[in-house]
């Protein structure tokens, strides 16, 4: 791996339309903080940049629902999330906002640079327009019936019921969310970024990281590359956002699409950080100096925005330039998802534990440790209240906290709070800890983004320390061998110091409390020195004979009893009941049915038995299968949103029920001539309705 002089760490920008939950913390913000704190501990030059994504349609929809302005919405959630991050010890060097003046300026500079090179393409397209509201409708402002599953409340970008990604034009009976009127199609012009123009450059860029990027990142990215990259709109008809910076009548009423604007926050926020340092150009050292490294921490749902789209934007900027050339990301350590009690976190379904609410009840350090030990590196992991309780009580309170308190208390009471003996290197190496191997393991784990391994290796020191103190029994030995007890306590206190260093990335507050109990002035952060890695100091005992402790000790971790967890477990039962009721199409109180229809209306629906003769996946649509059906003497092509529930092989040969007289629809460039019937079961699982009987193909349902 190349040796870099400095590192810029960025974290995906949380959307300022709601509070962050534990899934966000586990996937992005805690791993980034662990990495940054490790780098600082090692004396490296690193800055940690984050901020709020404050533009986009969901924010304007929330504002309209609440009767407030979009600025009111983003102000609320920016402050809420920043405060939650601070309470959790997430150590940003700068946390910005995409609504800031400098961010607007930065995004517009990128637009003008790329526009000036003739890279963007202008395309006229037809979009829905609400005549009564006098505005074009973005996808989230259109609702209608999903052409895949029949959900009558599908959004213009995605059906929440079956998960299919849609465009507003694919909806059946579309309605405007602004007026409930049927929108009309009108022509509008938009700017497009030609991703395909950079396909070969992006393939080379991704290929250069075959050996150091995670498999999930490479797989997600190559899926897009293998399908071929298409043009992507970078402007929208919207009032809230960054104005298209052109003196052109066709640019009136248009803003930059949030996917283009948000990722440039990493640049603008670094610029804002540099201004606060009193050196406005210092940000260039991190973004444009070839000996600097950029690391983007994200969740797996954001991969292609950071491995394809942001690099393509930077490539477009760099094209033809001899100066101010941006570095592309050196690594994009995307995590998998952390689930909550076996189910995916979902803000829209209110199935989540929000960070601020959690910290109102439990200490941040216990959460940091529990999540780090369940870090979803290569596969989805799970947060459970029982696991959180067990780790807090067993590993933090009984193992780490108990060892520290016993060591400090015994020294204070029996040796006047002074390190009572010198520790030789030989004694230090005889504790059952191979310090060189431990340091190597810590370095390798942090540098490789294996945070569960890193924290576990640090906690192994606490386990070894506890075994040493328990086995030596100085409280007994002191009666006959005071010198031996003194040697034991000197080694134990030095182990306390080693733990304050080793565990600092995951437990920074606890590490500083240990540091203080050991009699040190200042904080661990005051020890940071450029080019001096503190982990290497673990190879030798640090506390000399005669060193004075503070004379005080404290319980580092209070145990969590069942009574504290019981309300959370009851709350899970309530959330699960509500989620299961929603998934079953009912409220917690009663089953709800759609409005009554006349018998003649039902008679208009032509339901036919059909059989699947072939099936294949649809490109760029992970939830769709393209099916060829035999319906009597004819064949039909139908797109069905069942790819997450049935493989193509499982569908072939099935008898199915087809809505045979549904008007054809074009979805993802493919014509769908009907709709299949399916039933949604537990956890959103779809089950095909499969008619039974002989010679029924083509027969109508009676």
Swiss-Prot record:
Chain ranges for the short sequence motif 'KMSKS' region as given in the UniProt record: 344-348
How many cofactor units bind, and how?
A: Binds 1 zinc ion per subunit.
Q: Which catalysed reactions does the entry list for this protein? A: tRNA(Met) + L-methionine + ATP = L-methionyl-tRNA(Met) + AMP + diphosphate
Q: What is its EC number?
A: 6.1.1.10
Record: residues binding ATP: 347
Alphabetical list of InterPro entries matching this protein: aa-tRNA-synth_I_CS (IPR001412), Anticodon_Met (IPR041872), Met-tRNA-synth_bsu_C (IPR004495), Met-tRNA_ligase_1 (IPR023458), Met-tRNA_synth (IPR014758), Methionyl/Leucyl_tRNA_Synth (IPR015413), MetRS_core (IPR033911), MetRS_Zn (IPR029038)
CDD domains given in the database record? Anticodon_Ia_Met, MetRS_core, tRNA_bind_EcMetRS_like
Keywords for the protein's UniProt record, in alphabetical order? Aminoacyl-tRNA synthetase, ATP-binding, Cytoplasm, Ligase, Metal-binding, Nucleotide-binding, Protein biosynthesis, RNA-binding, tRNA-binding, Zinc
Q: Name one Pfam family in it.
A: Anticodon_3
Which residues does the record give as Zn(2+) binding sites? 146, 149, 159, 162
- What are the tRNA-binding domain coordinates in residue numbering? 601-702
- Cellular component per GO? cytosol
Instruction: Give the subcellular location.
Output: Cytoplasm
Which GO terms of the molecular function aspect are on file? ATP binding; metal ion binding; methionine-tRNA ligase activity; tRNA binding
- Quaternary state and interactors: Homodimer.
The UniProt family comment states: Belongs to the class-I aminoacyl-tRNA synthetase family. MetG type 1 subfamily.
**Task performed by this protein:** Is required not only for elongation of protein synthesis but also for the initiation of all mRNA translation through initiator tRNA(fMet) aminoacylation.
HAMAP family according to UniProt:
Met_tRNA_synth_type1
Record protein name field: Methionine--tRNA ligase
Q: What's the encoding gene here? A: metG
């Amino acid at each position: 791996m190349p040796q870099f002089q400095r590192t810029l760490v960025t974290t995906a920008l949380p959307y300022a339309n709601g509070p962050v939950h534990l899934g966000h913390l586990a996937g992005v913000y805690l791993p980034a903080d662990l990495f940054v704190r490790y780098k600082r501990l090692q004396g490296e030059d690193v800055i940690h940049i984050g901020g709020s994504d404050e533009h986009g349609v969901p924010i304007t929809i929330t504002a309209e629902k609440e009767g407030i302005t979009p600025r009111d919405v983003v102000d609320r959630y920016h402050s809420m999330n920043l405060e939650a991050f601070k309470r959790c010890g997430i150590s940003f060097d700068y946390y910005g906002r995409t609504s800031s003046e400098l961010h607007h300026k930065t995004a517009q500079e990128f637009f003008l640079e790329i526009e000036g090179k003739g890279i963007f393409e202008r395309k006229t397209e037809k979009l829905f327009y609400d005549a009564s509201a006098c505005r074009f409708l973005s996808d989230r402002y259109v609702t209608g019936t999903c052409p895949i599953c029949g959900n009558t409340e599908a959004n213009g970008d995605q059906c929440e019921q079956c998960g299919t990604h849609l465009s507003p034009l694919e909806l059946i009976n579309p309605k405007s969310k602004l007026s409930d009127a049927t929108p009309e199609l009108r022509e509008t012009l938009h700017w497009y970024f030609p991703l395909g123009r950079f396909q070969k450059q992006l393939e080379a860029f991704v290929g250069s990281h075959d050996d150091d990027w995670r498999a999930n990142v490479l797989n997600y990215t190559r899926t897009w590359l293998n399908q071929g990259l298409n043009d992507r709109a970078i402007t929208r008809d919207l009032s809230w956002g960054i104005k298209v910076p052109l003196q052109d009548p066709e640019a009136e009423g248009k803003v930059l699409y949030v996917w283009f604007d948000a990722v440039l926050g990493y640049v603008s926020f670094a610029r804002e950080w540099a201004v606060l340092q009193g050196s406005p150009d210092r940000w260039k050292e991190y973004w444009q100096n070839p000996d600097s490294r950029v690391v983007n921490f994200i969740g797996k749902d954001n991969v292609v925005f950071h491995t394809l789209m942001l690099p393509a934007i930077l490539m477009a900027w760099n094209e033809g330039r001899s100066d101010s050339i941006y570095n592309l990301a050196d690594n994009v350590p995307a995590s998998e998802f952390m689930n909550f009690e076996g189910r995916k976190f979902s803000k829209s379904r209110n199935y989540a534990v929000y960070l601020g609410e959690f910290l109102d009840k439990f200490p941040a350090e216990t959460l940091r440790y529990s999540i780090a030990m369940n870090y979803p590196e290569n596969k989805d992991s799970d947060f459970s209240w029982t696991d959180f309780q067990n780790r807090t009580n067993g590993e933090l309170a009984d193992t780490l906290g108990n060892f520290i308190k016993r060591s400090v208390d015994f020294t204070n009471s029996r040796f006047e709070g002074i390190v009572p003996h010198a520790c030789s290197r030989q004694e230090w190496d005889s504790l059952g800890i191979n310090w060189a191997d431990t340091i190597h393991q810590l370095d390798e784990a942090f540098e490789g983004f294996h945070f569960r391994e890193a924290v576990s290796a640090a906690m192994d020191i606490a386990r070894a320390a506890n075994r040493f103190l328990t086995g030596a029994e100085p409280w007994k030995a002191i009666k006959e061998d005071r010198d031996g007890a003194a040697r034991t306590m000197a080694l134990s206190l030095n182990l306390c110091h080693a733990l304050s260093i080793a565990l600092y990335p995951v437990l920074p507050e606890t590490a500083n409390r240990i540091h203080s109990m050991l009699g040190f002035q200042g904080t661990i952060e005051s020890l940071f020195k450029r080019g001096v890695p503190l982990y290497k100091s673990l190879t030798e005992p640090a506390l000399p004979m005669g060193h004075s402790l503070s004379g005080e000790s404290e319980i580092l971790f209070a145990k969590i009893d069942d009574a504290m967890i019981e309300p959370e477990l009851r709350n899970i039962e309530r959330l699960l009941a509500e989620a299961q009721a929603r998934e079953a199409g009912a409220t917690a109180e009663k089953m709800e049915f759609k409005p009554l229809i006349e018998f003649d209306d039902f008679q208009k629906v032509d339901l036919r038995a059909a059989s699947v003769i072939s099936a294949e996946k649809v490109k760029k649509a992970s939830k769709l299968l393209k099916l060829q059906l035999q319906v009597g003497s004819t064949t039909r092509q139908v797109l069905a949103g069942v790819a997450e529930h049935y493989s193509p092989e499982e569908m072939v040969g099935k008898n199915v029920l087809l809505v045979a007289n549904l008007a054809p629809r074009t979805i993802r460039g493919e014509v769908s001539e009907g709709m299949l019937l399916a039933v949604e079961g537990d956890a959103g699982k779809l089950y095909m309705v499969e008619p039974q009987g002989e010679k029924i193909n083509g027969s109508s349902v009676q």
